[in-house]
Amino acid sequence: MENINDITISYEDEGEILVEELGKVILTRGAWTSILFRYRERDRQTGAMGPPKAALRRYQKHNGLFKKRDAINLSVESARTLISTLQQWLDEGLLGAAAEDQ
C-alpha cells in the first residue's frame, strides 16, 4: 500500500470475505504507522461471520510502500484491561506533560 488510508485488515479468498473490516482509527502517521482495527472473521466451520474483534497493527513505510511489521489481536478481556489501565493513568496524571515531573 502506498497510502495510509488504503490500508485494510479485510481479506478475501476466491471472492469470499474471510476477514471483514468494520472500522479503523489511524493512531499515528509517518514512517511507522499504527492503526486500530475493528473486524470480524468468517467461521470456517459454519460459514457465519463471528463477533467483532479488535486488532492493533503497525506498518513501516519502506521504498514508498507500507508493510505490516507487528500485529496484536486484542481479546475482549485484554481490551478492557488496556482501556481501564490507560484511563487510570490519565486520571492520575501519569501520562502526558504533567507526568514528566513524576
Question: Model segments located where?
Answer:
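Positively charged, low-complexity terminal tracts
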Residues: 1-102
